[in-house]
Regions:
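Active-site segment of extracytoplasmic enzymes that catalyze sulfate/phosphate-ester chemistry
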Residues: 1-28, 47, 51, 57-62
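Active-site-proximal cap/lid insertion segments
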Residues: 4, 35, 39-43, 52, ...
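Active-site glycine-centered loops adjacent to acidic/histidine catalytic or metal-binding residues
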Residues: 32
Length: 174
């Protein structure tokens, strides 16, 4: 089992979050963070982000049904195998709502679309089923989940991301 996280940013590096925070903005990061392992000097909350919710490791972000995500520096065990991108997106929307009327900087690092090609079997995925000529076999190497409908999955993931961005715009315009 590989350790969680990647080599941290050098302490002399200033992040965009630090620049915004120093200018009086509230800052939030949502999604994939791969710039410092848990407990390092480059955790999101230590490099300018007031709020972080997501993966504190790029490798962990290759699974959309992880056993845990991070809420700031706290590892939160996820019950019932929820779809991570929906959880991350809900936290991002809440950050926008919580900071309405304030100057804020949001860093939305969703990992859609990416390996593995997997998502809930909901209306987004359903609208693409039987729309593509799928390859006869599609199997990832390593620990990635294979799928018999990679083009369908990819199209659904792009649409899901597009929906998330639309919801962010709607929330900003309120």
């Amino acid at each position: 089992i590989s350790p969680e996280g990647q080599e941290p940013l050098d302490g002399s590096v200033k992040t965009i979050a630090q620049l915004f925070k120093n200018a009086g903005y509230v800052t939030g990061a949502f999604g994939k963070w791969g710039l410092g392992y848990p407990g390092s000097a480059a955790e999101p909350n230590k490099v300018g982000f007031d709020k972080f919710y997501g993966y504190n490791c790029q490798r962990q972000a290759h699974s959309y049904y992880p056993a845990w995500l991070y809420d700031n520096s706290i590892k939160v065990i996820l019950p019932a195998n929820p779809y991570s991108q929906d959880l991350i997106h809900q936290q991002a929307l809440q950050f926008i709502r919580d900071n309405k009327g304030k100057s804020f900087f949001g860093y939305f690092a969703y990992s859609l679309p990416h390996a593995s090609l997997e998502q809930p079997d909901d209306s987004i995925l359903q609208m693409y089923k039987r729309k593509f000529c799928e390859p006869k076999a599609f199997k990832y190497s390593g620990n990635y989940t294979g799928t018999t409908i990679p083009r369908t999955q990819f199209a659904g993931m792009v649409t899901r991301l597009d929906n998330y961005l639309g919801e962010i715009i709607i929330e900003l315009e309120k």
